[in-house]
Design a protein with these regions (language model features):
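Flexible loop/turn connectors
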Residues: 133-239
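Glycosyltransferases and closely related glycan-assembly transferases
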Residues: 38-45, 105-107, 156-165
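An alpha-beta-alpha
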Residues: 71-112, 218-233
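Alpha-helical recognition/docking segments in bacterial nutrient-uptake
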Residues: 1-73, 77, 137-138, 151
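Hydrophobic alpha-helical segments within soluble ligand-binding/sensing domains
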Residues: 55-86, 126-134, 153, 193-213
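Alpha-helix capping/helix-boundary segments
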Residues: 33-34, 91-92, 99, 151-153
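Short beta-strand elements in bilobed, periplasmic/extracellular small-molecule ligand-binding domains
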Residues: 1-10, 85, 100-127
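Periplasmic-binding protein-like
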Residues: 19-31, 82-87, 118-119, 139-152, ...
């Protein structure tokens, strides 16, 4: 049996079959695509979206508020213009998610016209990421790379190491999620961090409401704090 939504390729039909084969009183869905959350919101079984692209979908859930405007502004103040966000494809298709739209708006505010270079579609596969990085570094290498997951970050660090690219000397590197792994890195990876207690309390309250037969679809979010770390710095000088 598949162990995650990623193993199911966020395929609504496959997920629907899995749900039908495993009856439950309620579902908690982690970091799902918009299409998946739309499907769950239309089912009679209560569902909770723990993160994921759920803007305007009538489903209970929680999320994180990361101030990408401040992050992008700080990068631009250090001379960065070639800023790239590597994000899952479901944030880009069939339409931009709230998160991807916020990144575009942050670029526009500082005078950068966003395009496919800044938000590339790469298929969320290891080989797709390598092809994407090859393309980015072929002509106009990015001066700042923003990632969304530790697996993507590790792949980028491996790619950099094989080519003698270092952060922050050659490119600033930021991950949007925290990880205990970062404490083992020297320099520590720049990232966002947040308190999960309020998010977990909300899940417990939702579960209690579901047990009482209440139709609870409230969404909450918590504010993340930017941890600068040591992988972000000024644009490298031209060689």
């Amino acid at each position: 049996m598949p162990k995650s939504l990623l193993e199911l390729d966020m395929d609504v039909n496959r997920i629907a079959r899995l749900v039908q084969q495993n009856p439950a009183d309620a579902w908690i869905i982690g970091s799902a695509s918009r299409e998946v959350l739309e499907w769950f919101s239309q089912q009679p079984t209560p569902a909770y979206a723990y993160f994921g692209n759920k803007a305007d979908i009538p489903i209970a859930g929680c999320g994180i508020r990361r101030d990408l405007h401040v992050l992008v502004r700080n990068l631009v103040e250090m001379g960065h213009r070639r800023i790239v966000l590597l994000i899952r494809e479901e944030h880009l298709k069939p339409k931009l998610s709230f998160f991807a739209t916020m990144f575009q708006e942050a670029l526009e505010i500082v005078g950068i016209t966003p395009g496919p270079y800044n938000l590339p579609v790469w298929g969320y596969k290891p080989e797709g990421l390598r092809r994407c990085l090859d393309s980015l570094y072929q002509i106009t290498p990015p001066t700042a790379l923003i990632t969304t997951e530790i697996s993507i970050l590790l792949s980028i660090r491996d790619y950099q190491a094989q080519r003698g690219i270092m952060s922050p000397r050659d490119v600033s590197l930021i991950n949007l999620d925290p990880s205990p792994f970062f404490a083992w890195c020297d320099p520590m990876v720049a990232h966002f961090s947040w308190d999960t207690k309020s998010l977990n309390r909300r899940v417990v309250r939702w579960a209690k409401n579901v047990a009482l037969g209440k139709d609870d679809r409230r969404q909450i979010s918590t504010t993340a704090k930017f941890i600068k770390g040591g992988t972000i710095g000024p644009v490298p000088k031209a060689k």
